């Protein structure tokens, strides 16, 4: 019994075609068998577009506020604006610190100067010094100071020492230095001496006229 060769060839071809099965994976056709897959130009174009889309989707994000930009140039300008704002803020903080330090120093130095001025410019001291200086300059006779000056000039040492102690206490009370009180005493004593000499001359003149 003879076999038709055509029939055997067709059976082989049908069995071969049935053994070659195509499998699709992620849009690509994979052929199981000895045959290699044929990649078309369309598939190559789609793969290239996928790679380019990945590069385009790269993010340009600001490190200060997290805002996204399309390109690096826009991102750089935005970050420069952030840097300028931060520098301006630091300058304002430094100016505020300098102002607070200056205010602190002026408030702590002012009480020292005012206390020094108050010590030598109290109303009692001004009245005390002006009263005696004006009396000496205008020639007004003051019994209290004339009696003390006579005691200083003609009294004993104990009286002078007591008066010096009293004047020292008065100076401490009114903020007057001892040398200023001594100067005022000298002025009062000289004025009293001149008054006593003038009165003596007047008495002698009247006595001569009467004789």
From Swiss-Prot:
ZnF C2H2-type: positions: 60-82
Knockout mutant characteristics: Reduced trichome production on sepals, cauline leaves, paraclades and main inflorescence stems. Reduced number and size of root hairs, due to reduced growth rate.
Region described as Disordered: 1-20
InterPro entries referenced in this protein's UniProt entry, alphabetically: GIS3/ZFP5/ZFP6, Znf_C2H2_sf, Znf_C2H2_type
Biased composition (Polar residues): 1-12
Any one GO biological process: regulation of DNA-templated transcription
Matches recorded under Pfam families: zf-C2H2_6
Induction (free text): By cytokinin and ethylene.
Source superkingdom: Eukaryota
Gene Ontology molecular functions: DNA-binding transcription factor activity; transcription cis-regulatory region binding; zinc ion binding
Expression sites (tissue/organ): Highly expressed in roots, young leaves, developing stems, branches, inflorescence meristems, floral meristems and siliques. Expressed at low levels in rosette and cauline leaves.
Annotated PROSITE patterns: ZINC_FINGER_C2H2_1 (PS00028), ZINC_FINGER_C2H2_2 (PS50157)
An example Gene Ontology CC term for this record: nucleus
Cited function: Probable transcription factor required for the initiation of inflorescence trichomes in response to gibberellin (GA). Acts upstream of GIS, GIS2, ZFP8 and the trichome initiation regulators GL1 and GL3. Binds the promoter region of ZFP8, which may be a direct target of ZPF5. Is not involved in the regulation of trichome branching. Modulates root hair initiation and elongation in response to cytokinin and ethylene signals by directly promoting expression of the CAPRICE (CPC) gene.
Extra remark: Plants over-expressing ZFP5 show formation of ectopic trichomes on carpels and other inflorescence organs.
Protein name: Zinc finger protein 5
Lineage, top ranks: Eukaryota, Viridiplantae, Streptophyta, Embryophyta, Tracheophyta
């Amino acid at each position: 019994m003879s076999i038709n060769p055509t029939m055997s060839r067709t059976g082989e071809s049908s069995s071969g075609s049935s053994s070659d099965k195509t499998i699709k994976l992620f849009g690509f056709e994979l052929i199981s068998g000895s045959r290699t897959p044929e990649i078309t130009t369309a598939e190559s174009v789609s793969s290239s577009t996928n790679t380019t889309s990945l590069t385009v989707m790269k993010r340009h994000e600001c490190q200060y506020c997290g805002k996204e930009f399309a390109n690096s140039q826009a991102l750089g300008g935005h970050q420069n604006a952030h840097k300028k704002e931060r520098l301006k803020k630091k300058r304002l903080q430094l100016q505020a610190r300098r102002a607070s330090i200056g205010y602190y120093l002026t408030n702590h130095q002012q009480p020292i100067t005012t206390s020094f001025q108050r010590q030598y410019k109290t109303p009692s001291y001004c009245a005390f010094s002006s009263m005696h200086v004006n009396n000496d300059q205008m020639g007004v006779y003051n019994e209290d100071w004339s009696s003390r000056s006579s005691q200083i000039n003609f009294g004993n040492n104990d009286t002078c020492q007591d008066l010096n102690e009293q004047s020292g206490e008065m100076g401490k009370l009114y903020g007057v230095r001892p040398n200023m009180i001594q100067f005022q005493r000298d002025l009062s004593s000289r004025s009293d001496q001149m008054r006593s000499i003038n009165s003596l001359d007047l008495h002698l003149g009247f006595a001569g006229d009467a004789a």
